[in-house]
Amino acid sequence: INTAHSENYSLEKAFDGLNRPWGMSFIDDHNLLVTQKSGEILKINLKTQEKIELDHNLKVLEVGWQGGMLDVLFHEGMVYVSYTEKRYGKHTTTSIAAGKLVNDRLENFKNIFRSDPPIDTDIHWGSRLAVKDNYLFASVGERAQGMAAQDPTNHFGTIIRLNLDGSIPESNPGLTTNKDWLPEIYQIGVRNPQGMAVSPIDNEVYITNHGPKGGDFFGKVSKGSNYGWMLVAWGGTDYDGSIIGDGSAWKPGLVKPIYRWIPSIA
C-alpha cells in the first residue's frame, strides 16, 4: 500500500449534524446520498448545505450495534440500499431495495433481494454495494454462523451478483458451474465483508473483509470461488485465542487474499 503521497491530502468538514451515517454515494459534484443507521436516506447538497430526507416504507430494524440502514449506491438515476430487514419476530436478514430518484422522491422503491434464511442474530450483515458491467454486486455477512459460510444453499458469508433490476444473471455459478449454489451467489467463504469497490485500474471488484482476532483482509471478487471461512481464518484466531480450523491461514483450493492484517486493523 503506497502512502508516499499522503502529504498531498487534507481533511475538510463538508457537512455535519448527521446521526451515525453508514453509507454515501455521490449523485454529482455537489449532491450525494447518505444513509443513517436509524433508517433515514438523506440527499445532501454540499454547496447549499440543504438536507432532504427521502421517504420510504422499508422495514428497517436498527438492531444491536451493527444493523440498520446500511449502504447506498446511486447509479444512472437509480438508488440501491442495503439494510437490516425485520422479517418476522426477531428474525432479520440483509436485504436490498431499489428505486428511481425523481425530483427528490423514490419511485417504485421496493425490495429486489432478501438473504435467506432469516435468523435471530444482530451482527455480521456485510451489506456493501457496487456496480460493474451492469451487474449489482453485494456482500452478505455470515451472521455469526461460522461454517454456514461453506454452505451455498444459504446466503451466509457470500458475495452475490444480480442484474440491476434484481433478476438473476444466467451466467451466475449456481446456473452454470456450481449447480448446488443458490442462484444469486457469486462467491462464498467470507465472514463480514464491509468494503467493496470497483477498481478504476483493472475494472475488477475488490472487497475488505473483517477477520476474527486477526485476519482482516483485502481481496478480489472472483466467480465461483471460496475464501474459506471458517475452514481458515486468514491467520487469525477466535476471540478467546483458540485456533480456528487447523490453524492454517490458507488451504489449496481456496482463494488467497491479496493482503491480510495480523492483528486486525478494524
Regions found by a protein language model. Name each.
Residues 2-146, 198-211, 265-266:
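Acidic, Gly/Ser/Thr-rich repeat motifs that build Ca2+-stabilized beta-propeller blades
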Residues 67-69, 142-266:
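Beta-propeller domain segments
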